[in-house]
């Protein structure tokens, strides 16, 4: 009887899988971390719940109610999970049959849609965006057969722009009765007028992903939300873990979503937008920067001369950016998280010193 290695025992799709390269996984030794779109400083919270001997609620009532009120939806339309990343995976697990169904997404965009599908053994189809990074609706229409979930990130990571709302409507009409459309609104707090939350009544197949990692400054909490109609939420509840949120996470999330927590978040957003405009203006004057793209988020995408050399030079100086060269249509591009004024100045000074 022949023996097999542990790796041989693993599923073939897992053996072939390239894991998502998160900012932390990519490493680096820096003082200026501008590669993960985090808020630059920590927000303090005190735990109020000490019942750590008991299992938590699956869907903590106060968290759900606070988020529903904030988002302008009913509590029955909210699911809380371990980051929006878990929401991405739950939607695939609930709606896609491995080896039969597919998801569709439009690169350049967030990398977890493909990783989540590939892990489960669900086909990934891609329709690259147009030159202006808007949706190729004809291309999507041509590839929809067999697709159960379509992911659209708006504002899009890493490009920073909003998807045209009329294109969203067209996509929702194309997919009606065929597939779930997922609007990933991880960065919507920086442009709240563009949220699709008000469209849920009109489109039963729309789902929206949200997070506390960006504007709420709680990336370390791992707390995200899916907004959808009750029928979708009930299906997701069948596949979510029994205790997705620990008691301390639920405690802090509820505080962050209190009226005063929302006010504080909006103050942070205003500060980041001011800093973003300062950094954009400065980048446009730097010789090694070829192009700075408009942003509706807390990060800036820019195209550089000799971007790999620039990236490494700043890395060696302890300034960690995110290289986007491998993404479709993003040759020469680096993504810069908007940090503090001091961090912005470090980036500006380092880039001005580049001889390329």
Curated annotation (Swiss-Prot):
Positions bearing N6-(pyridoxal phosphate)lysine: 214
Pathway linked to the protein: Amino-acid biosynthesis; L-histidine biosynthesis; L-histidine from 5-phospho-alpha-D-ribose 1-diphosphate: step 7/9
Gene3D superfamilies membership: Aspartate Aminotransferase, domain 1, Type I PLP-dependent aspartate aminotransferase-like (Major domain)
GO biological process, one term: L-histidine biosynthetic process
CDD domains: AAT_like
UniProt entry keywords in alphabetical sequence: Amino-acid biosynthesis, Aminotransferase, Histidine biosynthesis, Pyridoxal phosphate, Transferase
GO molecular function: histidinol-phosphate transaminase activity; pyridoxal phosphate binding
Keyword Glycoprotein: no
Cofactor(s) for this UniProt protein: pyridoxal 5'-phosphate
PROSITE patterns: AA_TRANSFER_CLASS_2 (PS00599)
UniProt xrefs under InterPro entries: Aminotrans_II_pyridoxalP_BS, Aminotransferase_I/II_large, HisP_aminotrans, PyrdxlP-dep_Trfase, PyrdxlP-dep_Trfase_major, PyrdxlP-dep_Trfase_small
Pfam family, one: Aminotran_1_2
Quaternary structure and partners: Homodimer.
Similarity comment text for this entry: Belongs to the class-II pyridoxal-phosphate-dependent aminotransferase family. Histidinol-phosphate aminotransferase subfamily.
PANTHER family: HISTIDINOL-PHOSPHATE AMINOTRANSFERASE, HISTIDINOL-PHOSPHATE AMINOTRANSFERASE-RELATED
Protein name: Histidinol-phosphate aminotransferase
Protein species of origin: Escherichia coli O6:H1 (strain CFT073 / ATCC 700928 / UPEC)
Classification lineage: Bacteria, Pseudomonadati, Pseudomonadota, Gammaproteobacteria, Enterobacterales
Gene from which the chain derives: hisC
């Amino acid at each position: 009887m022949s023996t097999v290695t542990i790796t041989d025992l693993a599923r073939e799709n897992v053996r072939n899988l390239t894991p998502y390269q998160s900012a932390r996984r990519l490493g680096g030794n820096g003082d200026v971390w501008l590669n993960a779109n985090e808020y630059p400083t920590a927000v303090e919270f005190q735990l109020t719940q000490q019942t750590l001997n008991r299992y938590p609620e699956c869907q903590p009532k106060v968290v759900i109610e606070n988020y529903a009120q904030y988002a302008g939806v009913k509590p029955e339309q909210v699911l809380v999970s371990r980051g929006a990343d878990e929401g991405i995976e739950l939607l695939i697990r609930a709606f896609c049959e491995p080896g039969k169904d597919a998801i569709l997404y439009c690169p350049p965009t967030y990398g977890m849609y493909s990783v989540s599908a590939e892990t489960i053994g669900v086909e990934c189809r891609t329709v690259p965006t147009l030159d202006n990074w808007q949706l190729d609706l004809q291309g999507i229409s041509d590839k929809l057969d067999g697709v159960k979930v379509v992911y659209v990130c708006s504002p899009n990571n890493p490009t920073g722009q909003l998807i045209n709302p009329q294109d969203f409507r067209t996509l929702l009409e194309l997919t009606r009765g065929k597939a779930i459309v997922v609007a990933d609104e991880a960065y919507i707090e920086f442009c709240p007028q563009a949220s699709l939350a008000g469209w849920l009544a009109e489109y039963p197949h729309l789902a929206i992903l949200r997070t506390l990692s960006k504007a709420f400054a709680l990336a370390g909490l791992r707390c995200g939300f899916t907004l959808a109609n009750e029928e979708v939420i009930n299906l997701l509840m069948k596949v979510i873990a029994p205790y997705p949120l620990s008691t301390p996470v639920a405690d802090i999330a509820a505080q962050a979503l209190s009226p005063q927590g929302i006010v504080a978040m909006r103050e942070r957003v205003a500060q980041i937008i001011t800093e973003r405009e300062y950094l954009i203006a400065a980048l446009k004057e730097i010789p090694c920067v070829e192009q700075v793209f408009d942003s509706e988020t807390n990060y800036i995408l820019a195209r550089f001369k000799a971007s790999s050399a620039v990236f490494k030079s700043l890395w060696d100086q302890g300034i960690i950016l995110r290289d986007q060269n491998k993404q479709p249509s993003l040759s020469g591009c680096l993504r810069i998280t908007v940090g503090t004024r001091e961090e912005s100045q470090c980036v500006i000074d380092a880039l001005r010193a580049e001889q390329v």
